[in-house]
């Protein structure tokens, strides 16, 4: 009988004070046997970079292949990984406006990491009372160095 893959639910968020400015990211990983939180920050960044970093760091934390339900409140992240990235690759990592894709190194890293997992991507409305999205937001905000 085939082994069933490990499952995890992940909530990520990024925050920035000013854009650009100091920022933070946070992730809540919900395993069958408990919860793990991770977070970090950067002194000069953007909100989109922190949103993307949260997802990359959460996926890098996982040391084996998982079936993942991943929740983000970032349309940039969800649309980027589920839709835009296909065209960016075809266009030599350029946007529809022929401009270089911003945060390219993070998109390249995410593109590589997602191949190791079976991820279903979800968008969740920010600040709408979702417990784990709020927790990820709190973690991200806690890392903003002022």
UniProtKB/Swiss-Prot annotation:
Annotated RNase H type-1 domain residues: 4-145
Name recorded for this polypeptide: Ribonuclease H
E.C. numbers: 3.1.26.4
Keywords for the protein's UniProt record, in alphabetical order: Cytoplasm, Endonuclease, Hydrolase, Magnesium, Metal-binding, Nuclease
UniProt cross-references to PROSITE patterns, sorted A to Z: RNASE_H_1
Major localisation: cytoplasm
Keyword Zinc attached: no
Name of the gene encoding the protein in the UniProt record: rnhA
Reaction equations catalysed: Endonucleolytic cleavage to 5'-phosphomonoester
UniProt keyword annotation of Hydrolase present: yes
GO molecular function annotations of the record: magnesium ion binding; nucleic acid binding; RNA-DNA hybrid ribonuclease activity
Cited function: Endonuclease that specifically degrades the RNA of RNA-DNA hybrids.
Organism annotation: Ehrlichia ruminantium (strain Gardel)
Quaternary context: Monomer.
Cofactor(s) this protein requires: Mg(2+)
Cofactor detail note: Binds 1 Mg(2+) ion per subunit. May bind a second metal ion at a regulatory site, or after substrate binding.
SUPFAM superfamilies with a match to the protein in the record: Ribonuclease H-like
UniProt-annotated binding residues for Mg(2+) 1: 13, 51, 73
Gene Ontology biological process terms, A to Z: DNA replication, removal of RNA primer
Signal peptide (from-to): none
Family membership: Belongs to the RNase H family.
Listed InterPro entries: RNase_H, RNaseH-like_sf, RNaseH_domain, RNaseH_sf, RNaseHI
Annotated GO CC locations: cytoplasm
Residues the entry annotates as binding Mg(2+) 2: 13, 137
């Amino acid at each position: 009988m085939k082994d069933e893959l490990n499952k995890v639910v992940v909530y990520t968020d990024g925050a920035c004070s000013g854009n650009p400015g100091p920022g933070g990211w946070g992730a809540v990983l919900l395993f069958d046997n408990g919860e793990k939180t991770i977070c970090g920050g950067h002194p000069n960044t953007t909100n989109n970079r922190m949103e993307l970093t949260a997802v990359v760091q959460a996926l890098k934390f996982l040391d084996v292949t998982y079936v993942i339900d991943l929740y983000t409140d970032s349309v940039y992240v969800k649309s980027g990984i589920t839709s835009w990235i296909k065209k960016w690759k075809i266009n030599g990592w350029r946007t529809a406006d022929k401009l270089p894709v911003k945060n390219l190194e993070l998109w390249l890293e995410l593109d590589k990491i997602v191949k190791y997992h079976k991820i279903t991507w979800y968008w969740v409305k920010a600040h709408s009372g979702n417990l784990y999205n709020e927790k990820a937001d709190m973690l991200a905000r806690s890392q903003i160095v002022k």
